[in-house]
């Protein structure tokens, strides 16, 4: 597992990460208010540029805010140059970004979830977003839009909803490059404000945070628990195939 750390200072709380190049064990410290997002950087839907730039803008003068970007693409080159370019454009900032690249052992991944306060999604469209659901199931509130499939489990009780609006788009496999579909454009200001609001909640409103965390877990339980999925599948099979149970 490789990691790239931008800004920030070490503290007592840490996550152990193995550096693949020399097999040495390094400490990646995660303290203060921690945000996490997991995505393939080559997937244009994920809109991670807004995640990074809104974070650095919202917390330009905040030293104890950390954004963890867990990259799922096999190639380090899939994001490193682009991420570095964003930093050049942003100028100086006191907040911290940690980019993780490579496989994480289960224990390391669980520590990352435990250290996280909010999971961040700024996608233009989603088919499900399993990492978001996983973090919410572990009582981590979301900063995310309420569109496409996320509309099934994102609401204001379990996170901070980012505003979005429809815009035309070209399907990835469209040879003629015509606008044949729609997606959602994220409201950047809304995302930046959600960062600021979430930070204030963690720092000054612990009871509000606990309620959001509990609601996040409950939302996923109502949407995708084994009992719920089993019942939905049973209804579908009975209706469409005439199966009896």
Stretches with model-predicted labels:
Residues 77-111, 118:
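Nucleotide-activated donor-binding/catalytic signature segment of Leloir-type glycosyltransferases, i.e.
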Residues 117, 139, 146:
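A short alpha->beta transition loop at the rim of the catalytic pocket in nucleotide-sugar-dependent
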Residues 124:
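Aromatic "clamp/platform" in nucleotide-sugar-dependent glycosyltransferases that forms part
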Residues 24-46, 52-55, 67-69:
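Conserved donor-binding/catalytic core segment of Leloir-type glycosyltransferases
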Residues 182-193, 203-235:
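A charged, aromatic-enriched C-terminal amphipathic alpha-helix characteristic of glycosyltransferases
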Residues 141-144, 160-162:
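Short hydrophobic beta-strand element within catalytic cores of glycosyltransferases
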Residues 104-116, 133, 137, 170-172:
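Short acidic alpha-helix that forms the nucleotide-activated donor recognition element
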